[in-house]
Regions:
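Small/polar, glycine/serine/threonine/aspartate-rich low-complexity segments that form flexible
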Residues: 31-33, 80-137, 268-282, 315, ...
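Periplasmic alpha-helical coiled-coil/stalk elements that build and connect Gram-negative outer-membrane
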Residues: 7-10, 157, 164-289, 402, ...
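Bacterial Sec-dependent N-terminal signal peptides
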Residues: 1-33
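Amphipathic alpha-helical coiled-coil segments
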Residues: 42, 54-69, 169, 173-194, ...
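Bacterial Sec-pathway N-terminal export signals of envelope proteins
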Residues: 28-90, 140, 144-148, 154-156, ...
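Metallo-beta-lactamase
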Residues: 239, 298, 381, 458
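Sec/SRP-type N-terminal targeting helices
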Residues: 53-57, 70, 104-128, 139-170, ...
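Membrane-embedded alpha-helical bundles of multi-pass transporters/translocases
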Residues: 62, 73, 100-103, 111-112, ...
Length: 477
């Protein structure tokens, strides 16, 4: 319930954003330049995605289960009525209501009244109206741990585990969404570059054709210009298909708040603020700090809490190896007012009933089996934790090394692309001076385009890796 209230607050904070997206879907503001930033995209994902809602529901279920676990300590009212008549003779008629109050330390307090009438009844029973209060105390088995305490302790740990499991779900979902977003950005940038080159090649083809008809260019130049235009047209088709697929893939993460999926409109494009971030900011990571952060990864915390759960189970199973030795004491009173005899403080002189119950399986086969299994579960969980921690550390190191390499590649590719651009401009100048050919200019341009495409791909990988590092330490929330 608390988390749903928080969700309502989040809905207020992102109201304008959702309205913005809904307007997309309804076709409003089509004349406006509509863009979607990564932050806007992730806000929608976090607010409306069914997977996150399911994770929140799992947390709420864990909260409710604690209430169920507390029922083991809930006071109860019990009652019994019995009567026997045989051969037109009433043997007995008994009525016995009772209140029982379990306590945290295994001690159970109780009190009740009894009304026994008839002609034939057990000599150990008290005839007429009587009352009693008493306690039952475990002296060995169930003294330090019992199923009620174990269930409640474990349910509280399960709640903490469900919170960390929710963080794991959110961490994984956001990483998948981020990867899809940067693929969307990447395909859009490549399509934009190719469209720009296609438009330029169209202008060049028109210019060459006019020059050919004016006798200024050879026919071979028109063929060269036409081939380049056709090649860019082909690349544009490929780029549009890739962008369409990336847009549809991005749409799989987008949902309305009424659990209805929606598709990102074609008119929407990625926000260009990331280019400023790339130019002005350099993210720095310190490997040792990342490895320290990985120690509190939600997956690691889940296994640590699971160990506590299994340790409680082991404590409970150990109780099966102990003999059951329970002491009980009832203070009795005539009539329904047992309080009068309690005030006399003569608890073991008069008006009392006491006893001891003892039970012990001779071979303890079930107890030994259950305890051994509980211990093996703990060992397996510790082994799983070691493996998971190692896997997380290796992922952190892998993404960190990839990030460091991509930083260098990015700087190098900027230089390569800039150099190719200079070669294109120089070749175009030589063409204007009659010292080069259109074929060479086109060749230079293709190499410059290849360098730019590679630069765009590296930029997308660079941003993906930044978020992958955060994902590897479990910090995407």
């Amino acid at each position: 319930m608390i988390r749903r209230l928080n969700n309502l607050k989040n809905m207020k904070k992102t109201y304008l954003l959702l309205l913005f997206v809904v307007l997309f879907l309804k076709g409003f503001s089509q004349e406006q330049d509509m863009t979607l930033s990564l932050d806007q995209f992730l806000e929608i994902v976090k607010l409306n995605h069914p997977t996150i809602k399911q994770a929140l529901n799992d947390v709420e279920m864990s909260e409710v289960k604690i209430i169920g676990a507390r029922s083991g300590f809930e006071p109860s009212i019990n009652g019994s009525y019995s009567e026997k008549v045989f051969g037109e003779e009433q043997y007995y008629q008994s009525f016995n209501p009772e209140v029982r109050i379990p306590t945290w330390f295994g001690i159970e307090a109780y009190g009740g009244i009894n009304n026994l009438e008839g002609n034939k009844y057990s000599q150990s029973s008290t005839f007429g109206e009587s009352s009693y209060v008493g306690v039952s105390i475990p002296l060995l088995k169930n003294l330090l741990m019992d199923s009620r305490r174990a269930t409640l302790k474990q349910s509280k740990l399960f709640l903490q585990m469900s919170n960390f499991e929710r963080d794991v779900v959110v961490n994984d979902l956001l990483m998948s969404a981020i990867e899809s977003y940067w693929e969307y950005v990447n395909s859009y940038e490549l399509m934009s570059v190719i469209n720009e080159n296609l438009a330029n090649s169209q202008k060049r083809l028109d210019f060459i054709r006019k020059s050919y008809f004016n006798g200024e260019k050879a026919e071979i130049d028109t063929i060269e210009a036409s081939n380049q235009y056709q090649m860019f047209s082909y690349k544009r088709n490929d780029a549009e298909i890739r962008f369409m697929k990336s847009r549809l893939n991005l749409s799989t993460f987008l949902w309305k708040n009424d659990n209805v999926p929606y598709e990102l409109p074609q008119e929407v494009s990625p926000n260009q603020n990331w280019k400023g971030d790339l130019k002005n900011e350099k993210v720095e990571f310190i490997l040792n700090k990342l490895l320290e952060a990985s120690q509190v990864h939600p997956i690691v915390k889940t296994y640590e809490l699971k160990r506590e759960v299994l340790d409680i189970e082991k404590q409970l199973k150990f109780q099966s190896l102990l003999p059951k030795l329970d002491l009980y004491y009832n203070h009795l009173g005539k009539g329904y007012d047992v309080g009068n005899t309690l005030n006399n403080h003569r608890y073991f002189d008069d008006n009392f009933q006491t006893g001891v119950k003892f039970e012990l399986p001779i071979l303890l086969m079930k107890g030994r089996s259950d305890y051994k299994i509980a211990n093996l579960k703990l060992i397996n969980n510790d082994l799983d934790l070691i493996q998971k921690q190692n896997q997380i550390n290796l992922k952190v190191k892998s993404y960190y090394n990839e990030y460091e390499i991509l930083k260098r590649q990015l700087d190098l590719q900027y230089v390569i692309y800039d150099n190719y651009n200079k070669l294109v401009k120089a070749e175009e100048q030589k063409l204007m001076n009659g010292e080069s050919s259109l074929f060479i200019v086109n060749s230079r341009q293709m190499k410059a385009l290849d360098a730019l495409e590679k630069l765009i791909n590296i930029q997308a990988k660079y941003f993906k890796t930044i978020y992958a590092i955060q994902w590897s330490v479990g910090s995407l929330k």
